[in-house]
Amino acid sequence: MSQLVDVPARGHQKVAIDIDFASQTIIGRTDITVNPIDSNLQKIVLDCYQAEIHSVYVNGDLTKFSYSDALKKLRIDEPNSTVNQHHQLNLQYEALMNDLGGINIFLSKPPGDELRPLIVSIDFSVHQPIFGITFVGIDPVDHRYPHVFTNNSIIPYSTCSWLPCVDGIWERSTWEFEITLPKTLSSLMHREKTQPSDLNNGANGVDGHDDNYENNRFDHQFNLSNEPDLLEDHDIEVICCGDLLDQVTHPKDMRKKTVYFSVTTPVAPNYIAFAAGPFKHINLTDFREPEDDDAMGSSAIDITGYYLPKYAEEVENTCVFLYKAMDFFVREYGSYPFNSFKLCFVDETNFPIISTPSLVISSNSILYPKDSLDQIYDSTKTLTWALASQWIGVYLIPKAWSDLWLIYGLSYYICGLFLKKLMGNNDYRFRLKKQVYRLLELDIGKPPISQRNINIPIDPNTLDFIALKSPLVIHILERRLTKTGGSLGMSRVIPKLLLQVMSGDMLNGCLSTSHFLKTCEKASHMRLDVFAQQWIYGYGYPIFRVVQRFNRKKMIIEMGIDQVQTKEAPRAPMSDKNFLSDAIRHLNNESIPTGLPVFSGPMTIRIHEADGTPYEHVVELKDSFTKLDIQYNTKYKRISRNRSTKNVKRDGDHNGDDSDYVIRSLGDVLQSDEDIERWHLYDYTKEEEDTMATEAFEWIRVDADFEWICDLRVRQPEHMYVSQLQQDRDVVAQLETIRHFTSESFTVSQQVSTVLLRTLLDNRYYYGIRQEAARALARCAIPELDWVGYYHLRMAYLEKFCFKDSTIPKSNDFSNITEYYVKCAMLESFPNIRDRKGVTPSSVKKLLLDLLCYNDNANNEFSDAYFICLLIDSLVEGLIPRGETVQYAFSDPEHMEFVNQVINEIDRYMRIDACMPSFKNIITCKSLKAKLRLAQTFHLEFGPKELLPYTQEGNYVLVRCIAFNLMLQAGALKYTPLIKYIFYILTNDLSPVVRRSLLYSVQDGLGALARGGTKSDVASEDLIVEEDITKAVEKRIDITSRASISGAIEALRNDLGQNHDFATEIWNAINNPKSDLLTKRNLLMICRVLYKAKSSLLVTLKIPSLIPRLRAIHLGKGKIVIKKAPLKQITSKTKEKSTSPTPPSITINPIKPKGPTLKIKLTNLRSTPPSH
């Protein structure tokens, strides 16, 4: 990154801007205070691109400067350049990322020995920015409220896209802002030209900016006729990071106002943000109870929510909890680092959360109305993390990019602790364990969370992985600090770190991994070197296989813990999302890292012995195999643990004698003889019960205190897992049991299905466990068990949610939110019921269709939009066979008739959603996905042509993004007109959200093509099956080769890499100045995968193009002379003037390979350039 030459990190910057909505222009001046430490300072370098620099002053004197726009510079202007020169452009990009620069200011005289501060003043303007600042509702076809906001992030070079500065996360300074804008919406809509602004009342104003900026403005009125509410006049508010100082009327234009802000806490330009528009506001601290207000006293912080009109109810409903989060963080981690907290909701932001000092800009997409249930947790977690990042992320920042994991880990960790207080310990531990299971799927061949060489800007998939693993690492570190070290753990470490920032002991507020570990070591008095090497700088995770045996002679439990991660390491799965990054790593010859052979550390083993007492044993793992001899403690008769609770003795019924007695446990529902017969329940037999009674202990839990991120499997009998599920009150233990029941190594039984059913119907269980039990019942729905799992699941659903002896559902009632979530989990489980051929039974499909057809939400106070989407998804999933059967799914006429019924029902819901839109049009989005899946499986007419109308402007943004993604998954890159259309949208669409989403969709589409196309091409003609053994063998070889990353790259190069139109369009998009830096970077990565780099260039020689010909001359008297005719010069056509791009007309014709053609010409030059 560029830096001010010899300028300390902390300085001061003043920014004065005038916002013109009509022309999407910002005109401004910035004053940067430079404190030189070199008396011979001759040049100052600032970061800036996408702006126009009009003049530069140093201490009031006009100064020479040079300016180079990175967006315009990052291109190859040579007209004969091709996509094969992508490596040359990539070198330019890497150089820019290391030192963006842009503005070079040449000092007329050095500061001298006095080293007085220099005031660098820059007059600049930004017209129709494509990155950094977003204007919404300005275009005539856009009927949303006009507003503008900064669209930056922690990623470098976002703020300098509209403001000259030293753009780096470590370049912190104090700030002042003067923002001039219209007072009201009617003033904003006024058409007359804006007068030149005097932003700083003369002295530091913009003097003589170019008139071209006035002449090039959009000459149109805002078209708001279709939105009657928009015609109401609203005050234009500006919300900025820092503190509001003053607001005055503009001295020259009474329709404008100037608002003043100050940021007294030094922050980097990445954390500078503002938003302006017709925002309303709500004081979210009004929801605080009076007693809570008194308890907080002077520590109470004001929280204000800003929103566009019509979002008042959604903001109140979504943010009602925020004052509790603020109070929690203040009590636990010290005073809030700023004076107030503001939350502003806007449209069209690429990031769900943009955190800056005292201000968070958030997307309207995280808001939800009162009748929506499914988004509650996700939105609550997102906003809680946004607030947590004020302490850790804005106030406390990483010292290097390799320390970024700490910021994500600590902020998400304290976010989770608040959610634990808000939603309960069971919810916290359950979700934490689910995150571990998710990590086990993803952390295969992944780099460490602390990477020395990380590519900037950081890939979103990498950030998501860091955000997932980092808080889990902090959690297990907390467990070890509190258990082994005997300290208060993170509850002491985090406040100490924040106190060091406040006191100035932590330089510039930058936290490094080494400093964090040293602080933890001081707090716990234990060394963390080994922990850091394994979990922070190491790869992978341990895989434990535990065996145990009770030795009756020695009265000990012999146990062996084997680490098998080097033997049973799962293969890294290929996916569409990860294909591009995997391909780049392959081309860089980066080997897939393997996990460590041995992970060491303490582990807690809890043995529930026969008397019902749990005994804990802490062991230290040091080797790949650890052998343990654990002393057995029980000397009394065992307590019968209620496996068959048919004849349950109540507490106290044993009359004080020493005989066995039964303790009631969870899952003791459906115990009567009538229930057992009606529900087809199976308990253990008397012989099995007697065998179980001889066991020395009830069950064993390894890693009982959740101190490890690991794949763990304990070898113990089925009935011990049943005891663990029914008698262990820890939701993690219950979740581990159900996960064991669904593992491939476990053989299910009718008794397990019975236990899962009772778990599902017992509302004393945490609802997440009931959901998992519902999903696990599908595992028991197999012919070998007479489909008992299906019978149990079906009976449970019909009993709870349908009319008696019918598959017609009752009217929806979602007032009990836990029952609603369990109901949804049961529906998700139905399509997983399969026969030996991978086909869902017809009764399951008919049940799901009835539930969809007869869904009734008339008497429900909550929306059923998500529920309908779930029904559609489950029904479509059930229709699609798995395994080899999918190839012949279209051959059954009866099944195809049922498929058509499903499509008709989906179309009905799409028509309803068009007339009465659901929340975010989610029904339309889900229906499009469902229809494409059916089309690809059953060879129906639904593909890019049918999806195209949904991609056009006027549709909801989410619908457009989904439609583009589905088009590319359906093979849109096979059609030349669609290739041109896609890249036109990628560089010219008004919506930054659509542009960014389309970029990632193109990457996913490449992954789909590389891994085997689009399942089956969508065809309108009858399918022709050719019984050709050779072709079948070739197809099998092609599928096998695409399974490896090298084979997938080669196949993609032979397919899409030979498409000249794609090569032309992607190269034009890369060289287009409208493409932002991230888009250029990702497209260059695609080029590297598709095309081999060539350091050669076609040279065009300016010589006449001549065509020789012969002519016959009749001399008379039968004499003919054949001579060489005068050479005719071919005039070259003049190139037409380039005009503004227009959307290409689209006629979808599949690209057909051309056959070989032999051409013979008499010419002195080739008409086409030679291949090279």
From Swiss-Prot:
Keywords: Cytoplasm, Nucleus, Transcription, Transcription regulation. GO terms for molecular function: chromatin binding; RNA polymerase II general transcription initiation factor activity; transcription cis-regulatory region binding. Pfam families: TAF2_3rd. Its main location: cytoplasm. GO terms for biological process: transcription initiation at RNA polymerase II promoter. Residues 1145-1154 have a biased composition (Low complexity). One of its GO terms (cellular component) is chromatin. InterPro entries: Aminopeptidase_N-like_N_sf (IPR042097), Peptidase_M4/M1_CTD_sf (IPR027268), TAF2 (IPR037813). Transmembrane segments: none annotated. Residues 1131-1172 are annotated as: Disordered. CDD domains: M1_like_TAF2 (cd09839). SUPFAM superfamilies: Leukotriene A4 hydrolase N-terminal domain (SSF63737), Metalloproteases ('zincins'), catalytic domain (SSF55486). It is found in: Cytoplasm; Nucleus. Belongs to the TAF2 family. This is Transcription initiation factor TFIID subunit 2. It comes from Schizosaccharomyces pombe (strain 972 / ATCC 24843).
